[in-house]
Amino acid sequence: MAAVVLPPTAASQREGHTEGGELVNELLKSWLKGLVTFEDVAVEFTQEEWALLDPAQRTLYRDVMLENCRNLASLGNQVDKPRLISQLEQEDKVMTEERGILSGTCPDVENPFKAKGLTPKLHVFRKEQSRNMKMERNHLGATLNECNQCFKVFSTKSSLTRHRKIHTGERPYGCSECGKSYSSRSYLAVHKRIHNGEKPYECNDCGKTFSSRSYLTVHKRIHNGEKPYECSDCGKTFSNSSYLRPHLRIHTGEKPYKCNQCFREFRTQSIFTRHKRVHTGEGHYVCNQCGKAFGTRSSLSSHYSIHTGEYPYECHDCGRTFRRRSNLTQHIRTHTGEKPYTCNECGKSFTNSFSLTIHRRIHNGEKSYECSDCGKSFNVLSSVKKHMRTHTGKKPYECNYCGKSFTSNSYLSVHTRMHNRQM
C-alpha cells in the first residue's frame, strides 16, 4: 500500500517558520559576535582633535558611535565605550530636551541593551515633522533625513539643513575680507584660513600642512598611492575627483573654455587662464630669436627646440625623435595601434583627443576659423594660420642646415629629414 504524505497545516508552517527564523538569528548573532568587536569599528579623538570638529561633525560622530553600540549590544557583545561616548550620551539627552522631540521606549522590541554601561534609554523611537524635512528613527537607531527635492538621505538633521541650501542658493555666511559667501559657517571658517594663513592639519609623513582636513586626506594619497577615482573609458586612476573630470574631457572631446579673441577652446580652466596671457601680455615669455611670445615658460622652452633643432624624446621602436614628450606618447600609439579616442557619431577612433575634436567638426559642419583676406574658412586654427601665410609670404620656420624657410613646422620637419638621411 502506497504511503500518503499529507501537506503541513498552516499552523505547523508558522511554527516551523518561527523556530527556523529564531535559529537563524541565533546562528547569525553567534557568528557575528566572534567576528566583530567594538574596537574594530570605534574611532577615537584626542581632545585637541575633538575641539577642531564643528557641531555637524560632532553630531555625525555621536550618531555613528551610538548606533555601533546599539548594534553590537544587540549581538550580546560586552561593549567598553570610548571615553567620549558617555559625554555624547549626555549631549544626546540634552539635545532631545532642547529640540522638544517626543521620546519613549519602543513598545515593539524587547530591550536588547544588557551590555555593560548601556541602558534602555538609548533605544527610543523619535519622530519629528516640519515643513521641509522628515526625520524618523527605526528600531536600529538609523536616522532618515530626506531632502524633499532630490530625495538624498543624510545621517543628521543639520547635514540635511546645510544640504538644502544647495537648492535654495542661500549663502548667509560672508567673508569680511573678500566678500565671498558660503552656505555653512564651517565652510566660511575653512575659507578664512586662506587670509590668516592658518593650516592646522599636518601630514605625518612629510610635515606639509593644510587648511582643511579634506585637503590633507587627498594629499595623503600621494604617500599611500591610493587612487580611488577611475576613468571608465581607459582605466586611468586619480587621487582626486577634480583631476578625473578634466581627464574625461579627453575622451568626450569637450572643451568648455573658449577664448573670445582667437576662438581657441580648452579642456581646463587653468590652461585657458595661461592662454589668455598671450592676449593680455601678462606674464609673457618671449623668444629672443624670433620674438614669439608664450604664456608659460615650459611652452617657450619647447619652442626653443625649433631654433636649436633639439629633439630630446626618441622612439625606441623606430628611432624617430620629438620635441615634446606628449608628441612621442602619441607617436608610440602608431606602433601599438592604440586609438583610445572614439567618435560617438560614426565610431571612428583616433590616437589623440585633438584629432577627435577636429574630426567631429566634419559631422557638425563647423568651420570656425575664417581668413580675413579671402574669406576661406577652416575647422582648425592652425590651418587658417598656415593659409594666411600664403597672403603675407611669411615663412617663420628656417632650416639650420641650409637656411631654407617654410610656412609651417610640418614642412620644415619633412625637409629636415632629407638632411638627416644625407648625413
Swiss-Prot record:
Q: Where is the KRAB domain?
A: 36-107
TM regions (residue ranges): none
Where are the zinc-finger regions (C2H2-type) in this chain?
145-167, 173-195, 201-223, 229-251, 257-279, 285-307, 313-335, 341-363, 369-391, 397-419
Alphabetic keyword roster: DNA-binding, Metal-binding, Nucleus, Repeat, Transcription, Transcription regulation, Zinc, Zinc-finger
Superkingdom? Eukaryota
One GO cellular-component annotation of the UniProt record comes to: nucleus
Q: What start and end residues bound the annotated signal peptide?
A: none
UniProt keyword Lipid biosynthesis, yes or no: no
Q: Name one GO biological process term.
A: regulation of transcription by RNA polymerase II
Q: Name one Pfam family in it.
A: KRAB
Gene Ontology terms for molecular function: DNA-binding transcription factor activity, RNA polymerase II-specific; RNA polymerase II transcription regulatory region sequence-specific DNA binding; zinc ion binding
Alphabetical list of CDD domains matching this protein? KRAB_A-box
Q: Which cysteines are joined by disulfide bonds?
A: none
Q: Where in the cell is it found?
A: Nucleus
Where it mainly occurs, coarsely classed, is nucleus
Main function? May be involved in transcriptional regulation.
* Family note: Belongs to the krueppel C2H2-type zinc-finger protein family.
PANTHER family registered for this protein in UniProt = RIKEN CDNA 6720489N17 GENE-RELATED, ZNF44 PROTEIN
Q: What is this protein called?
A: Zinc finger protein 557
Species assigned in the record:
Homo sapiens
- Lineage of origin: Eukaryota, Metazoa, Chordata, Craniata, Vertebrata
Question: Its gene?
Answer: ZNF557
